[in-house]
Each structure stands twice: as C-alpha cells, then as structure tokens.
Amino acid sequence: MTKRNINKIIIVNYTMYAGGPLVLSALCAELRKIGYDARLYFVPAFIKGKVDYRQYRKTILKYNLKILYKEILYTLFHRIVRFSTFRQQGRSSMCVPGIKIQYLPVFNRKRTIVVYPEVIYGNPLGAQNVVRWFLYYNPFANEKEAFGKDDFHIAFREVFNPSDLNPQKRIVTISYFDAQLYRQYNMGTREG
C-alpha cells in the first residue's frame, strides 16, 4: 500500500498515563509531521478475549462521544469554570502535542490502516489493514484467534517480539520525553 492509497491511519489508544499510551500518541504525532492523516481512537478498556464486537463498538462509541462532549464543554466554558480536571478525565493520555482524535469509528475500511497495541484482542474496528505493535509481551500467546492471519506485526523492542508472529524481527521504537515535565511554574519573571 503506497502513501497515495492510504486515506487515514487510526491508532487505537487507551486512556491512562503510562508508557504505552504515550508511545502511541508519539507515533501519531510523528506520522502527522511527515504528512499522514494519523488519528488516535480511544478505547475505554482492553478486550481480553472473545466478545460481542457489536456491543463493544457501542461501548467505545459512547465513550468517545463522552470525550467529545467534554471537549465541547471545555471549549465553550473554559474561561467561566475551571475545567482543567474535567478535561483531563476525557483526554488523560493526550500529553503529546500535535495529535488529532478520531471520535467516531467511521472510516474507509480499504484505505485505512489501524494500529492496535498488543493488549487489544481481535479487530474491534473491523479494519482490513491491521498493524499489531507489541509494546510489551504478547498477552495472547496461546490464542491463535487473537490476531488476524494477515496482520502486520512489529515490536517496540526485541525482547517483546513474538518470534512466531514476527520472525523477521521488525522493530519500531519511538522515544518521547515531556519537555514540560520539570518546568517551574511558580517562579516570577526573571530579570538581570
């Protein structure tokens, strides 16, 4: 699939402040920098086994509409009421600047690549082009139905690489450091 054939790249992310969501957000930001229409799509929980995908998609849709609702409220009323914690609840893993959110699971299934982390069982978005990025050890090592036979597998580090799924040892590593982490906000303006 060439760049011209790719309509969108959707990166499935989960909302928590941890290394996996940060790296997925950083991947989204880097893909956007080089010209791809990459977006994050949040899921409220991991799929740990076979589930009814229709019911799970409804749960995901409700969750993303709730995030959208919080974003709209924050945009309209951020000066009137302190919505910083209210907004953070909806976008807790979006600390990497330069990303875009996919709120609805509506996309061209043939011309979209969906990137799933290793903790997502199956293909809940029903995409035809799936990339599995192993950011940690494979939690479904003994379950052949967890991943599709045509999925493209990559690992974050060689130690996390499942050799049966990725014998070529394809590795994609992205480093991210929050430059605002040690910034002091309580200091006055510096003079002299």
Residues covered by each model-derived region:
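N-terminal pre-catalytic "stem/leader" segment of glycosyltransferase-like enzymes
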Residues: 1-113
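Catalytic core of nucleotide-activated saccharide and alditol-phosphate transferases
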Residues: 95-192
